[in-house]
Regions:
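SAM-dependent transferase fold signal centered on methyltransferase-like domains
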Residues: 1-156
Length: 156
């Protein structure tokens, strides 16, 4: 997903189009000339429908779901089985933020690293929608962040 596509998907008219087309065949949505940014809307409809079972919180909050990141994401059920708890956690590979969201329920503060600037923006937006105020998304590689930080984490 490009930054331009992300910005487009954040627009109110496009969010409404996604909402109005949930439940429709994504191919029909893509071919519908009345739908603004039909291809983008169709892709979001497709992945939101798939998120109903894999990422139900993301579906309920109508998060933005880049296809590749969705395919690589842990399911919420799998992420919930992580047992650690404590004060601070570091997620080295944020992606959509599924693991960071689960960690945020067990830790006071979570730092989630994502090196892709667009995916970092997507994750930050989605985590805000999901109410994860204690999760901070940082756009950096794990190597860069670990070399620069002096902070200590209870769990990495």
């Amino acid at each position: 997903m490009t930054r331009e596509e992300f910005d487009t998907l954040c627009r109110d008219d496009v969010r409404r189009a996604v909402e109005e087309n949930l439940g429709r065949d994504p191919l029909a949505v893509a071919l519908d000339r009345r739908t603004p940014h039909a291809a983008l809307v169709a892709t979001q409809v497709k992945y939101l429908e798939r998120a109903r079972t894999k990422l139900p919180s993301y579906y309920a909050a109508r998060c933005i779901l880049p296809p590749r990141a969705f395919e690589q994401a842990s399911s919420e059920a799998c992420a919930a089985h992580k047992e650690p708890a404590g004060d601070t956690a570091l997620d080295l590979t944020c992606g959509l933020g599924v693991d960071a969201l689960a960690l945020g329920r067990r830790f006071r503060r979570v730092v989630a690293l994502e090196r892709d600037p667009v995916l970092a923006a997507v994750a930050a937006r989605n985590l805000r929608l999901l109410g994860a105020a204690n999760v901070e998304v940082v756009c950096a590689s794990a190597e860069e962040y670990l070399a620069a930080t002096t902070e200590r984490f209870d769990w990495v």
